Amino acid sequence: MMDTDAFREFKTGLTLLRDNYVDKALPHMKKAAELERNNPYYMSYLGVVLARSEKKWGEAESLCDSAVRMKRNQAQLYLNLAEVYATAGRKEDAVEAIQAGLKFARKDVRLTIAMNKLTDRRPPVLTFLNRRHPINRQLGILRHRAMGVLGGQR
């Protein structure tokens, strides 16, 4: 069956990708995407592998973007697109991809974690206290609210 062959190739490629063997993962991802051309996950992960192994940013972005357009409510597809952008050194685009993902797949905590990794945190209000100190936390919340009301970014 073509579907099981594609899934087997994808699974092998994903294992190699997660173990950081991107060059070995590439043929498996290509094969999976060839066998099942309209599968957004296969397309998206092929984009990630192309970006990490061959630095083909344009092709990788196109694959991931097409996958996102096919299934807008799947957080992993936004995470893959953001990874392609981040690998290419396009941090702002990665943040935009995560923000778009948060609009369509709000409940997925992985998007929030990825956003926190990509964005810079403000320093604690009282630098002589630990960031987790209750006073710093409350002052930080107040600062965040005040900046939202005033429209300030930093």
Q: Which positions does each model-derived feature cover?
A:
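Alpha-helical segment of the N-proximal tetratricopeptide repeat
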Residues: 4-35
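Residue at a conserved register position within TPR or TPR-like alpha-solenoid repeats
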Residues: 16, 50-51, 85, 119
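Structural signature of tandem alpha-helical TPR/SEL1-like repeats
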Residues: 18-28, 53-66, 88-100, 124-130
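Canonical tetratricopeptide repeat
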Residues: 45-46, 80, 114
